[in-house]
């Protein structure tokens, strides 16, 4: 699997940015300098911290990139039931509002990294945002289905991902299974 750290620096390194004010949790304003890049992770949340938006933010931080998120779903695990997964999608309007807020607060987003979306409706909302905001760089790390989702939904999700997001991606970082699937092998 191609990892995000190897993909992001060259992509973000070619974007010219300007300083912007943004609010902090203390109600003060902080200033991002003109060289700090901003990346938006559109992804699911996963409690272990080993995947999803949490890991994207850690990766951005390690690369010196300021990260913000739009959560698409919440995935939980049941340690008492063979670590079974529970998938809960975030309301599409909330996803839209999160993306809109990230852009409005920072005035720009230099790159978008898309992870687990989980439903065709969510994919549609993200595709609309990509069209509306014309983000300079789009990294797609497709997660077609997780344990706990209905297997029948995987085909609709896969088709929506191929149709609406794959053509808009500058970089795709799938695992081998998804690479074979995307290549129709």
Map each language-model feature to its residues:
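Conserved N-terminal subdomain of the carbohydrate kinase-like
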Residues: 32-41, 53, 57-151
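Acidic, Ala/Val/Gly-enriched low-complexity intrinsically disordered segments
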Residues: 2, 7, 15-17
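A conserved, positively charged/aromatic
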Residues: 165-166
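Short, glycine-rich nucleotide/cofactor-binding loops
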Residues: 43-49
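Conserved small/polar residues in nucleotide/adenosyl-binding loops
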Residues: 178-183
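Receiver (REC) domain switch/active-site residues of two-component response regulators
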Residues: 170
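Charged helix-capping and loop-helix junction motifs
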Residues: 154-161
């Amino acid at each position: 699997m191609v990892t995000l750290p190897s993909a992001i620096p060259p992509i973000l390194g070619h974007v010219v940015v300007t300083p912007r004010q943004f609010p902090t949790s203390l109600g003060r304003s902080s200033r991002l300098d003109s060289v700090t890049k901003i990346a938006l992770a559109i992804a699911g949340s996963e409690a272990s911290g080993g995947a999803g938006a949490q890991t994207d933010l850690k990766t951005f931080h390690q690369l010196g990139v300021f990260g913000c998120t739009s959560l698409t779903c919440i995935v939980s695990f049941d340690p008492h039931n063979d670590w079974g997964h529970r998938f809960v999608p975030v309301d599409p309007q909330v996803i839209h509002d999160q993306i809109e807020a990230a852009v409005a607060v920072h005035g720009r987003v230099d790159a978008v990294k898309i992870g687990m979306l989980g439903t065709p409706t969510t994919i549609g909302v993200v595709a609309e945002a990509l069209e509306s905001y014309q983000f300079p760089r789009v990294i797609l790390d497709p997660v077609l289905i997780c344990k706990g989702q209905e297997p029948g939904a995987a085909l609709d999700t896969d088709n929506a991902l191929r149709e609406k997001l794959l053509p808009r991606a500058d970089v795709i970082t799938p695992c081998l299974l998804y690479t074979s699937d995307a290549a129709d092998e």
